[in-house]
UniProtKB/Swiss-Prot annotation:
Alphabetized UniProt keyword annotations: Cytoplasm, DNA replication, DNA-directed DNA polymerase, Exonuclease, Hydrolase, Nuclease, Nucleotidyltransferase, Transferase
Gene label: polC
Chief location bin: cytoplasm
Protein name: DNA polymerase III PolC-type
InterPro entries registered for this protein in UniProt: DNA_pol3_alpha_NTPase_dom, DNA_pol3_finger, DNA_PolC-like_N_II, DNA_PolC-type_N_I, DnaE2/DnaE/PolC, DNAPol_HHH, DnaQ, Exonuclease_RNaseT/DNA_pol3
Compartment annotation: Cytoplasm
GO cellular component, one term: cytoplasm
Protein species of origin: Streptococcus pyogenes serotype M2 (strain MGAS10270)
SUPFAM superfamilies on file: Nucleic acid-binding proteins, PHP domain-like, Ribonuclease H-like
Matches recorded under HAMAP family: DNApol_PolC (MF_00356)
Catalysed reactions, as listed in the record: DNA(n) + a 2'-deoxyribonucleoside 5'-triphosphate = DNA(n+1) + diphosphate
Amino acid sequence: MSDLFAKLMDQIEMPLDMRRSSAFSSADIIEVKVHSVSRLWEFHFAFAAVLPIATYRELHDRLIRTFEAADIKVTFDIQAAQVDYSDDLLQAYYQEAFEHAPCNSASFKSSFSKLKVTYEDDKLIIAAPGFVNNDHFRKNHLPNLVKQFEAFGFGTLTIDMVSDQEMTEHLTKDFVSSRQALVEKAVQDNLEAQKSLEAMMPPAEEATPAPKFDYKERVAQRQAGFEKAAITPMIEIETEENRIVFEGMVFDVERKTTRTGRHIINFKMTDYTSSFALQKWAKDDEELRKFDMIAKGAWLRVQGNIETNPFTKSLTMNVQQVKEIVHHDRKDLMPEGQKRVEFHAHTNMSTMDALPTVESLIDTAAKWGHKAVAITDHANVQSFPHGYHRARKAGIKAIFGLEANIVEDKVPISYDPVDMDLHEATYVVFDVETTGLSAMNNDLIQIAASKMFKGNIVEQFDEFIDPGHPLSAFTTELTGITDKHLQDAKPLVTVLKAFQDFCKDSILVAHNASFDVGFMNANYERHDLPKITQPVIDTLEFARNLYPEYKRHGLGPLTKRFQVSLDHHHMANYDAEATGRLLFIFLKDAREKHGIKNLLQLNTDLVAEDSYKKARIKHATIYVQNQVGLKNMFKLVSLSNIKYFEGVPRIPRTVLDAHREGLLLGTACSDGEVFDAVLTKGIDAAVDLAKYYDFIEIMPPAIYQPLVVRELIKDQAGIEQVIRDLIEVGKRANKPVLATGNVHYLEPEEEIYREIIVRSLGQGAMINRTIGRGEGAQPAPLPKAHFRTTNEMLDEFAFLGKDLAYQVVVENTQDFADRIEEVEVVKGDLYTPYIDKAEETVAELTYQKAFEIYGNPLPDIIDLRIEKELTSILGNGFAVIYLASQMLVNRSNERGYLVGSRGSVGSSFVATMIGITEVNPMPPHYVCPSCQHSEFITDGSVGSGYDLPNKPCPKCGTPYQKDGQDIPFETFLGFDGDKVPDIDLNFSGDDQPSAHLDVRDIFGDEYAFRAGTVGTVAEKTAYGFVKGYERDYGKFYRDAEVDRLAAGAAGVKRTTGQHPGGIVVIPNYMDVYDFTPVQYPADDVTASWQTTHFNFHDIDENVLKLDILGHDDPTMIRKLQDLSGIDPITIPADDPGVMALFSGTEVLGVTPEQIGTPTGMLGIPEFGTNFVRGMVNETHPTTFAELLQLSGLSHGTDVWLGNAQDLIKEGIATLKTVIGCRDDIMVYLMHAGLEPKMAFTIMERVRKGLWLKISEEERNGYIDAMRENNVPDWYIESCGKIKYMFPKAHAAAYVLMALRVAYFKVHHPIMYYCAYFSIRAKAFELKTMSGGLDAVKARMEDITIKRKNNEATNVENDLFTTLEIVNEMLERGFKFGKLDLYKSDAIEFQIKGDTLIPPFIALEGLGENVGKQIVKARQEGEFLSKMELRKRGGASSTLVEKMDEMGILGNMPEDNQLSLFDDFF
């Protein structure tokens, strides 16, 4: 027994007989960890063997009891040299385990503590009944049992459960018999009670009839019991139990109806201890309505039985009773006018760091009666637009700010340099070891130095210093210094004076000198000694500037790189000597490579212009004071993201100074330079820095608590002193001190969501750096950073005294908020770019084309439509938008590509005339290409001009051209024609980059930006974060809790991006900072385009956005045109062969059985998916108008399924008459007799899914008008089901392109298949595709089976689509050839007669670059060997092997070497 252990036994008065037992003979205390803040002591004991259970219990009880008397909590564990696995000892310790947390939860203890254990096959086996041998107990409790046995001294045991059938049956039998006994007892009790009642009743003649069973009274009794029942925390439920009562919030609801008409409400609730799945049944609609209170966000009390759901296999409450309860949200209890203003709040736009939306932040502040609230996201202002709109709505001032990353422009290598020859100087290279990073709160424990001259050590200094307290385990672990090193150490003042003498007449040198010098100066100042004034060289900055190509410049990496010995890193003497050796290497390289000989040159000639990239970041809060400040803020954000981005957006101090007008600065959090100075350098240094700012921030002590864990501050008292020091800094610098909350979430219970988000970043993130080392090392806890009310903040700062707390929390924040003006973040008008004579050009182009087609004078219907549209377009300043689109389309046309239109632009006849869209929105009509005579059908009898019968012009006999889709202009620019036009265009994917550059060319580089987007954490991603958090931090959550945590963690900004085709154009009479900052997408500083910092939707009503999207259809059409020489414009839209594809397969020369589908829709854009092919099979369209209907029906929401489909099946309506596209509603209702304005309004309500959301009075007015004009009821009911509708102009553009592609499939099939595989096919399997029909059909069958079993991969699903087309092509008599080393193209399929030759990229794993390299190499000569193919062709060994297996390489040898036999044969 060690002396220390014996002393402890004396203190706890351990019985002598136990102390003298063999168990204690070699007992020792390995380690004691003391946690001063929490008053917890952890003992780690060593024994020769596991203690007898009685001895263990005695030791445990006496240890706990003795230390409890001193208000100290104790835990201990044991390491035993020998372990006894006898069943009796294991059984005794097994039962003991349930007396210790965390094995003593009620459900675990009650279910497991009485079970028997045995030791078999190196495992502790628990014999358990089957109903508790489940994953829940294995996952949630067995790990705790393993840990407890390890603490008992058994080492790491493997513990498992086995089901004991006999026990299961016995317990089940006991349960049944017990329940039966209870039932029988209840019956007997009722009989006894009945007899007692009868005995008390009056004589028979006076008897009254026996009272009937009062159902209402029984319900009332049950309800009363429900009201009074104890609430069970959800976290305590771990097994099936009856009549449990929960209270909590509903966060997910799903209602289902069974085939029998019963309803199931599946919902999830949380009480913030955990979450639970619940289920409530309702027998019919009437009963279902009683449970309308089960809604997302509702607070409920529920009672029911906990059972294992047979489908989800998780515990679920079957709800018997439910009641809505009042949940009392936190309130700000201070009177009006005495409420604080929050000046430091993050929203979910703070990347992977904060949770609240800006709307919820502002709403909470407004609800609490705060007059203002600030937004200070990390380095971005992406929440500004939404914050601006919400604040105006809520009637509260939004203060727009950010928490910036401030850096010095140039970080000096030398401090206080003088004119001195570096070669002749004497250097004192020193290092200090400390108990922490704070010079004000931590202590020096070692100073060591090497005095060096011309590379030689001439004298050394090495002294330990006693800090006056035991060293922490963290300090010892980091530095290697123990309390023994400090036993005979000199006093601090003595060492400081000696070191000052040692340093005279020298240049001081240290690695990361700002820390070492700062620590020394703080100690000099504390002891009234002169601070350092001589020159200092920082070897960290020296290395960064001398060797910028190195990624790491720490002392360890540098000594390894330069082969300098560093045996004991983090002991000052070794570090100082190593730093000295490095110094002279650096001086030599600086002299030889940069000509640096004088100390002054280090900063002037060596410090790089971009040294800000390596500078230490300090946080500052920047606020917009006025409109000038807003623009400067936008400029700063842009510069930090574009010019000064390095890991994070940085703002150099001089850049901030240049744009400071209209901005106010706060000192931010513990990462700010003023706070850092208070902690590391003292109040005087902090005052000097504070003068740069407009106010000093202090935060609640709880926010600074992680600094205690990191040993930067000693304890709570230390935190409070730092806050007092900051207030003193404000007083001396004459700066107001504001108490801010550093808000990262709104409610205290939301802390876990941020924890999950932050920990998902991994240990590479600074916030997740672990404290200490080893497997058990954990990151510092995150601070309690919820949005605090005024009274909560006053409580946090109560230690300052009532008056001072009120001043910093309320008065100063209100006064500072008053200094800030209201600003306009989002402009109220549209600012279009300027193009000279845009209005005249649009009008001229429109009439020029109209005259060309329809003659001059124009038909009245054309003339009036043009006049109406131009009045709107020119009058509202939209001409430049039209002209810009026309210029882009025209340029792409000139490069040989068609451009398809999207959206409703085809509703504009002006857009048609100037060439933006091919869709003609006029009523169906004939027009003569020779004499321009025209005929218009305006009665609605024809849906599309393409469906008109062919006929000659009655005037000149020339065959008429047919056109017109009958689309009103109102669907594009609104009824009054003043809606900002949104022109979306489908360019060929091949030509899209050129089209984007066209925008720059037209408007200028400085005015064209990609439309920015913000990517947030999706719920599925958040789910992964939660599961990762479970794994990494030893948590176990039930499924409902995982769902809640994932939902809470979702929505946080993760990255930025760009719209695939959106280009924002800034007017050339303004600059981009009038609207938004700019940045690179996803922080990719190599990107060729800058994006808007704001999500483009936030400013889409202020600036022009051009949607220049890439699409396969124009690419496909261009490919077909190149192959055939046919101009796609000349392809008729009513080709009989093409239309025949929609009714059968005969036109393809195959049967439905051969190609597996009854029509010829495979591979036709818009109509080739399984869903639309099914619609075609049901409706059998025969006209272009019906194809438009199909397109609208397939793209809408609740337009086909459960709506038009049923009407057609039941014979109520036809494909022609159902509602298909949004525009059809307005046209149909006008033809029915409704006023255009009402027809338009009804269309708008229906297409946006608002029909059932508008007031009943408004809806009934529309219904009455429709019925008055004989609109059938089925039509009205159909309107009520629709959620979203497709524009007819969009459908027309898509269908027109589709029919052109289909034309080639019918009339030029090999060209069609060549284009399809070159452009549309997503997956290839060449071995199958070139293997013939049998191979193709077999593979399709294989994938079909996998699909049925949900086993098919995404690649296989894509491959199936490809194989469908291959199968069709082969069935039509064409062939699919093999890859040919000398004939295949790199990326395009080739036509050889009736055979398609695949390109190299069709081979799995072979990319475009390798394909092109092979083509280039074969032009230089034949490949003589596989080695040569790999070398010259760039193909990997795997690809060459794959080619060989497919027979592509023939008999190609492995290498070029000729064998002996080649000379003879």
